[in-house]
């Protein structure tokens, strides 16, 4: 089949969730010998992330005219679009270029004149799209279609110690609210015996403050800058404290009990659904006045309750099996008429 064109956004204010979802799907397509190209409305750091993953990456203005022009030049088999900035009219213009369009969505808040919608949010169903798609639109809904890297499909069993020994702190690709230094201090003070693994995303501007905070804590705190194997860090942790984006699916797949923090308004649905599924405990919004107390209470409770950690781990693995990218890749190839 012809190439697949990915159109997405990323950056310090947006994060990397959209880009990482697309990279996971592109990786699954690449395994099926499908060529993939990215057209980004993003800063150089994001472009470097895509290029470093082995894909052709072009930076454009990000508007629909720019994308339509590239569609006409490339004539891709399928166009995959993922950004909260993309409106119904934007999708309509892309579809008007004559190639099937796939929308990666998790808001269910606007008409999507596309051939296929992928939404991995827990709790989403066809009724959420009744007014937003045509009967011909194929819907791939729920965590079975979570777009994760292939290593998350292969996870060993998790040992649940009586008391937690390691905590993973991860906030995604950026830290615009400077939460990580505070989070590190809070958890270190509350759980004075645990080892702390701190993940620094590629768009973190506060590395020096985080490093100074970790140095003050001592050898218990280890910094991991853009780790190549974040799955291993998740499997090595007894608890994670995480933002409410794409990382939640990875933590569920690795059966990592989690304290969730809402970093953006669009994470509400994710966090609510994951908490209802028993996969995490939600501490609140990053602007919540009593966030420190909420985080400290929850990490201590989990650290000292192995039965609750075991229940969360089982719920996570039941919800997300890590094979979503394979399923979506197969559906994209069907859409292109090659499978």
Report residues per predicted region.
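C-terminal alpha-helical cap of glycosyltransferases
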Residues: 321-339
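C-terminal "capping" alpha-helix adjacent to the active site of nucleotide-linked donor transferases
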Residues: 282, 290-307
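A nucleotide-sugar donor-handling region in carbohydrate enzymes
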Residues: 113-178, 206-208
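Active-site and donor-binding regions of nucleotide-sugar-utilizing enzymes
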Residues: 6-16, 21, 25-28, 40-132
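A short, well-ordered alpha-helix in the C-terminal region of glycosyltransferases
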Residues: 301, 308-322
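Short hydrophobic beta-strand element within catalytic cores of glycosyltransferases
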Residues: 40, 240-242, 257-266
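Donor-nucleotide binding loops and adjacent catalytic segments primarily
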Residues: 155, 161-237
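Acidic donor-binding loop of glycosyltransferase active sites
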Residues: 235-246
């Amino acid at each position: 089949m012809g190439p697949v064109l990915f159109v997405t956004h990323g950056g310090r204010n947006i994060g990397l969730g959209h880009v990482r979802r697309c990279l996971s799907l592109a990786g699954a397509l690449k395994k099926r010998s499908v060529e993939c190209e990215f057209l980004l409305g993003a800063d150089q750091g994001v472009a470097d992330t895509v290029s470093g993953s082995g894909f052709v990456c072009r930076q454009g203005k990000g508007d629909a005219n720019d994308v339509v022009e590239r569609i006409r030049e490339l004539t891709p088999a399928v166009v995959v679009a993922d950004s909260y900035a993309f409106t119904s009219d934007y999708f309509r213009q892309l579809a008007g270029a004559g190639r099937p369009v796939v929308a990666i969505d998790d808001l269910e808040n606007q008409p999507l004149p596309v051939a296929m919608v992928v939404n991995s949010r827990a709790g989403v169903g066809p009724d959420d799209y009744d007014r937003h798609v045509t009967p011909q639109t194929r819907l791939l809904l729920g965590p079975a279609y979570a777009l994760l890297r292939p290593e998350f499909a292969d996870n060993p069993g998790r040992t649940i110690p009586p008391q937690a020994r390691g905590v993973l702190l991860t906030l995604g690709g950026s830290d615009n609210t400077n939460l990580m230094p505070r989070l590190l201090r809070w958890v270190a003070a509350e759980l004075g015996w645990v080892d702390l693994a701190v993940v620094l995303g590629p768009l973190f501007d506060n590395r020096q403050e985080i490093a100074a905070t970790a140095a003050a804590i001592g050898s218990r705190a280890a910094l991991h800058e853009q780790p190549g194997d974040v799955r291993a860090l998740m499997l090595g942790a007894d608890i994670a404290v995480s933002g409410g984006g794409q990382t939640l699916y990875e933590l569920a797949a690795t059966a990592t009990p989690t304290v969730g923090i809402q970093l953006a308004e669009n994470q509400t649905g994710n966090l609510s659904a994951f908490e209802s599924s028993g996969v995490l405990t939600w501490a609140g919004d990053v602007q919540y006045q009593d966030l420190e107390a909420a985080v400290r209470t929850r990490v201590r409770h989990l650290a000292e309750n192995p039965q609750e950690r075991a229940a969360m781990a089982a719920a996570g693995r039941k919800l997300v099996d890590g094979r979503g990218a394979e399923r979506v890749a197969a559906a994209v190839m069907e859409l292109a008429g090659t499978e």
